[in-house]
């Protein structure tokens, strides 16, 4: 199983983020995934860094993969996104992954005036985005006419230096169609985990992943205090809790069920000691 650190780009400086991500990579994590919002969900007044700028910074300052879980399609024109993704592919020597979806917080759209809140329109737009990305990355001259995007004799250079992995999250029928057509990784919403076997057949060849909140009890730690603090901060839904032995068992079961990657969202905001011990115990054992 691969392990990625999910680290929302808030509550800490960019320099601190780089330190924690590199600690995670040194401990065995494969890389980092950021979020993409115009205001932090349920914490709108908190400061937050831009998703693509933060990915560029971490790509330069750390050695693992960098990506997002996931970019919101409505925030960027696909021609802009195509250029950004290729630039990051070259800058990171192939360590950038393009995670993208049609938006998990629809209230952002009218607040910032970025697009329709209607699900059908958002999925249609995302479909066109993938088609435009593929066309522009080919290096050919592109003319494209869709409902949401129009290009006339457009061309971009350079193209990708490496294959840019595509990560798509979701479980709806049209989202799964996009996963089967375009994705390398399919991130299954944890509330749909009980439908995994049924849905996996519709995801094509995309490799399945899962995001989980994790509360890690280190050796010698106060279990009741650590878990109690986490449950006061966060929901118990989709929340793995325990010491190294318990979490090894938990993720081994996920692995046996067919999950190939976990995005670990630590409840202590990526405390370096937690990252190091989790890597040395849980990740090392499962590998």
What are these regions (language model features)?
Residues 1-287:
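Active-site-adjacent structural elements that line small-molecule/cofactor binding pockets in enzymes
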